Amino acid sequence: MEGVLSSLLASSLIVGFPSLIFVCSILIYYYLCVMKKKISSKDSLPPVIGVYIMRCIYSITQYWEMIIPQIKLYRISNDYIVFQCLSVVFTLKVMDYLKDGPKTIRELSQLTKSSEKNLFRVMRALTQEHIFNYNQSNQTFSLNSCSKLLTSPPPPSSSPFEQNGILSTNDEELGCIFSMLSYPTFIDAWRSLKECIESGVSGFQAKHGMTFFQYIDEKDTYIKKIFDSAMRQSYATKIHTQIINGYDFSKYKKVCDIGGGIGFLGFEIVNHNANTCVCVLELEETVRNGLEQSKVDEKKQRIIEEQRLVFKTGNMFIPRSIPSANLYIMMQVIHDWNNNDAIKILSSVASTMRMERNHTGQSPKLLIIDSILDDNINNDTYKRSCIPDIIMMAIVGGEERTLSQWGHIIKESGLQVLTIKKFNRPPFLSLIELTIQ
């Protein structure tokens, strides 16, 4: 044990102190600048410095886990327990009850019809994880910046989406994503992960006997509403802003967003490009969801009335159902599918693009917005998409792909790469611009 502690101390001296000195220096400099009024106290630290600080902290934690591997195993086990605790209090709507202000555990247990003792133990554990705040003097729990992200929308209106608690008015909230991940149907799919690995089909299909998309279309339309709404909350990563700033949409008059959900990216494109119209191609149920949810936003409703954005029912596997356009977009669509289906989808789009070229004499472009895994499995950037890749495997039967894997399905579909642009901010997607061969 003494040897382990000595190694830990040595690693702290080697790895921790330089990082700690750097972080402290930045904070002292920031404080002095505030004192001298060179910058406002409300200004945040520059993003680069913030990212570096987080990397320093992460690297120190990672180094300790390498020295004492038991720490890693305990952390992984604890993470699962924390998720279960958080899932329960989320289901009990504890966050919603705390929106009006701090409450004692007795008040919370009465509101949630729960065991006061057991609820307190769970809340205490989540407080230690900095998900809630606890005031020792008056023994009340309250929301913090983390738990506020998991509150529901304002009181229900006539909209069925608000009545179901899945229409969030705050782009920063993550309630819909958490609802989806903690939904019993999803949990059952994770319990079938062993069957997924053994059989090669998704855990969802192993458990429910059909694919995820078949299930939400045929058996459980409520989870489809959650799924569609959860896609909105990718706004929390500001990915749509990255895309708008990272690609010139203004040179395209007609854009078709294939599998564009309820129009999140489409509305952003229209808002920033006055001469561009967008067609969102989706399945019938999603089109209904998109039109319904757009009704609560006056700006979106006006855009639809002006026909600058239209929803169209179609099937991306069938070329004739894909409308003509100058630019086709597929944002995080291909990763939902295995290679055979991905090639079928891309071939279908390529066929439509070829018909458009024969008709107009101009070749449309296809913009794929998706993750690209690093070919080197030991590269730190590989970690960014490994967990999403497991989600694809277990739930929808799709996968995240390396550049060489992307190259294979693109070539097999009769397409070729023009440009690739990688974003260096979460969720670390890439823009792959394609044309027909």
Swiss-Prot record:
The active site is at 335 (proton acceptor). Keywords: Methyltransferase, S-adenosyl-L-methionine, Transferase. Its EC number is 2.1.1.-. It comes from the Eukaryota. It catalyses: (3,5-dichloro-2,4,6-trihydroxyphenyl)hexan-1-one + S-adenosyl-L-methionine = 1-(3,5-dichloro-2,6-dihydroxy-4-methoxyphenyl)hexan-1-one + S-adenosyl-L-homocysteine + H(+). It is an enzyme of class 2 (transferase). GO terms for biological process: biosynthetic process; methylation. It holds the Pfam family Dimerisation. Belongs to the class I-like SAM-binding methyltransferase superfamily. Cation-independent O-methyltransferase family. COMT subfamily. This is O-methyltransferase 10. The gene is omt10.
